[in-house]
Amino acid sequence: MLPGLLGRHAHGLYRADRCSAVCLDPVSLLSEIAPEPILKSIARGRMVVTDLEVITITPTSAVIAWTTRQSRLGVGVPQPVTAGTELALGPVNGPLRTVHDDPTPRAFHMVEVTGLEPGRRYRFKATSDGQQAHAALLPTLQVGSCEQINEFTTLTPPPGEYLTTIALTNDIHIGEKRQGIVLGSLPTSVQPHPDQVDYPQLMLSASLDDLTTRRGHPFVVVNGDITYANLPDEVELARQLLDGYGEQDADWVATRGNHDHPRRDDDPFGDVFVGYQRNQTILDPSGVRVLAMDSTRGSGGGWIVPDQYDQIMSELESDPHRPTLAVTHHPVTNEAAWTSISGPQFMLRASDRLRLQLLENQAPGVFLHVAGHTHRMRRDRADLLWAHTQYLENAACAAYPGGFSLLHLYTGGYLLNFWRPSDPDAHDWLYRSRWQVMGLGAHLMLG
């Protein structure tokens, strides 16, 4: 038993209410490896320094990003403008100190500052060539957001002993050729540049590489939509990339998403990963259980069939108090269903949403349920007023917001943070994919 794990809320989620130090040494500068934009010969015009985001806050670090570009004309991807990267940071009641000043011209700017103090409030100023970066996305424009007040508070670790870290990633879409809602010739999706056509592979590879080299090689839950259409070559490539990270069930587990649903005559995903509507249970050496369920039905919404309910109930009833991370590709709350731009028909059917929440409520150990599918980062409200389980939608890997989350577990609670990979090519693609759905998509994906 791991007492106290259920007693703390999630911290550090990527959304506007995450704002809550200066010990500035050492400083790790992700912008040193950030990309120069793909379009290198650009008329400067009027530079806009925008899309300011406090991406990640931990007890001892923060990641801040922004872009430089021309003013947007029409509905296409705006021209990037290259500029330098400067970040000043200091205690909220003290002077700002320059922690990074890199004149290398680039359009996507990202700086990670480490060596901060837990539970301390900092202020910052991000600039490029003397112009201050400003927020542009709806969640970052909320009153009191980190980006509006240019302040953040580092997190305080939960009490108790550190147990383990689990990485969460989803919506990879290997085999996909355009990002966004594809509606014929309408500009609702983003066409990758010729050297970005394999962007799903790029984003997964970059994430797995960061997890190996920068984040301690944690166990990874790859939570659905791993392929675009469950084609044999897509499944084979996905398996190859994951096998490069480690062994199935020992280093990673893969669930099925709606894009991975069985085809009419075959099921390549089932042949290589796991059969249709099969529950998977992973016991971490720390004692934490991962309950990986299959919520898929067809190409959109989802369900849970009776046989899988039997598997789920048998597992939970065998040890109801064991600390358990539950995952499905589809979100399982009504709030998620009714706030998604795709609507409730794109979600798990209503009866299954309620039944899963009831089952999890009967098992005191289920402290968190993580889903993907919507491509956004969002905490959801449980439908049961007395629920002890918390619910989270994790952002997509394949495109903007683009990355993975780390769930750090302690005996007294947990921390959860979103991270973007550090690969320069990944940054190039994030700059471009931010403009999916005619630029509206990014406003809907950050909480």
Q: What name fits each language-model region?
A:
Residues 18, 22-157:
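Beta-strand-enriched, solvent-exposed domains that form extended recognition/catalytic surfaces
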Residues 32-56, 61, 377-378, 382-447:
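Binuclear metal-dependent phosphoesterase catalytic core
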Residues 63, 85-87, 99-100, 207-219, ...:
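His/acidic metal-ligating clusters that form di-metal
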Residues 70-74, 139-231:
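N-terminal active-site segment of His-dependent metallophosphoesterases
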Residues 99-101, 170-204, 262-274, 299-304, ...:
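Acidic/histidine-rich helix-loop elements
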Residues 133-158, 232-319, 343-355, 364-365, ...:
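Extended active-site neighborhood of metal-dependent phosphoesterases/phosphodiesterases
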Residues 163-176, 287-297, 325-329, 390-396, ...:
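Active-site-proximal beta-strand elements of phosphoester/diester hydrolases
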Residues 171, 224-225, 257-258, 329, ...:
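Active-site glycine-centered loops adjacent to acidic/histidine catalytic or metal-binding residues
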